[in-house]
UniProtKB/Swiss-Prot annotation:
Component of box C/D small nucleolar ribonucleoprotein (snoRNP) particles. It is associated with the U3, U8 and U13 small nuclear RNAs. Part of the small subunit (SSU) processome, composed of more than 70 proteins and the RNA chaperone small nucleolar RNA (snoRNA) U3. It catalyses: L-glutaminyl-[histone H2A] + S-adenosyl-L-methionine = N(5)-methyl-L-glutaminyl-[histone H2A] + S-adenosyl-L-homocysteine + H(+). It comes from Dictyostelium discoideum (Social amoeba). SMART domains: Fibrillarin (SM01206). This is rRNA 2'-O-methyltransferase fibrillarin. S-adenosyl-L-methionine-dependent methyltransferase that has the ability to methylate both RNAs and proteins. Involved in pre-rRNA processing. Utilizes the methyl donor S-adenosyl-L-methionine to catalyze the site-specific 2'-hydroxyl methylation of ribose moieties in pre-ribosomal RNA. Site specificity is provided by a guide RNA that base pairs with the substrate. Methylation occurs at a characteristic distance from the sequence involved in base pairing with the guide RNA. Belongs to the methyltransferase superfamily. Fibrillarin family. The gene is fbl. By homology to other fibrillarins, some or all of the N-terminal domain arginines are modified to asymmetric dimethylarginine (DMA).
Length: 334
């Protein structure tokens, strides 16, 4: 079904071209492959990205420790496309789009028009957080507004574009987000978890912390906490048990930070997602060695990696994404 519109985003990175949904999917240790093409990389430098379609080719699935390359490419459109309507504020009249539910990630949508993008249903219609484009569909009481999720501004969105299978964040989820910054990604997580979920955002720096607090004033399911994530005991009375811990702190002791916060707040069999920037941990060692060392540290803390996305290129340079499960009462894996 068709809709119209899409407001013009003012805060996109300069030179931030479009990466595709053709990213391959590898198992733990498998080689993920990016999309095809030559879109320029934004935010973070001059990587050249891939411009792929949503219907990327299928490849073999790599298992934990396997070396198979490939995997399924971009997401295929599912049922439940949104109805057509008027353009969002600032949108171009006549720009037809189709909004569909993502087939694998609940609470995430695919917007198809001149460009193909991921989006979340805006829980604060009429408001953008970081200048992102917005698309409105439907009429009257059926009108809905979607916010385009920019993969050059969000590690989770980059992972979704690269074909990650599961982020474990869905409507009703309780999420602890370590390294919240000004709230760009948290705002989309807020959209996904909805009114029955909650997002706790930990940020140490006061300047982005002010932006985070300002965003949270309009999103009642976001709880900003301006504190040092290395000392979770300082905010233990503010946070309940959570389903997912996400960490994007780029610190040498990142694995320890995740382990400490998981011990306090992550429920047994809950999940974690860690964005690893190898150069921030050890700039002298090869990226693969640094990532494997971090994985070893996580295993010793009962954090069992299940999926490794070796690269987030072209969206984020020198970043990997590790997703796994917390076995609180199991023995540590050496």
């Amino acid at each position: 079904m068709e809709g119209r519109g899409g407001s013009r985003g003012g805060a996109m990175a300069r030179g931030g071209g479009r990466g595709g949904f053709g990213g391959g999917r590898g198992g733990f240790g498998g080689g993920d492959r990016g999309g095809r093409g030559g879109g320029r990389g934004g935010f973070g430098g001059g990587d050249r990205g891939g411009r792929g379609g949503f219907g990327g080719g299928r490849g073999g699935r790599g298992g934990f420790g396997g070396g198979d390359r490939g995997g399924r490419g971009g997401a295929r459109g599912g049922r439940g496309g949104a109805r057509g309507g008027k353009p969002a504020a600032g949108g171009k009249p006549g720009a037809k789009v189709i909004v569909e539910k993502h087939p694998r990630h609940e609470g995430v949508f695919i917007v198809r028009g001149k460009e193909e993008s991921l989006a979340t249903l805006n829980s604060v219609p009429g408001e953008s957080v970081y200048g992102e484009k917005r698309v409105s569909v439907g009429e009257g009481e059926d009108k809905k507004e979607y916010r385009i999720w920019n993969p050059f501004r969000s590690k989770i969105a980059a992972g979704l574009h690269r074909g990650v299978d599961e982020i474990h964040i869905k409507p009703g989820s309780k999420v602890l987000y370590i390294g919240a910054a000004s709230g760009t990604t948290i705002s989309h997580v807020s959209d996904i978890v909805g009114p029955t979920g909650v997002v706790y955002g930990i940020e140490l720096s006061h300047r982005p912390g002010r932006d985070l607090i300002g965003m949270a004033k309009k999103r009642t399911n976001v709880i900003p906490i301006i504190e040092d994530a290395r000392h979770p005991q300082k905010y233990r009375m503010l946070i309940g048990m959570v389903d997912v811990v996400f960490a994007d702190v780029a610190q040498p002791n990142q694995a320890q930070i995740v382990a400490q916060n998981s011990a306090y707040f992550l429920k047994n069999e809950g999940h974690f997602i860690i964005s690893i920037k190898a150069s921030c941990i050890d700039s002298t060692a090869p990226t693969e060695v640094v990532v494997q060392n971090e994985i070893t540290k996580l295993k010793k803390e009962k954090l069992r990696p299940q999926h490794l996305l070796k690269t987030l290129d072209p969206y984020e340079r020198n970043h990997s994404l590790v997703i796994g499960v917390y076995r609180k009462f199991g023995s540590s894996e050496k």
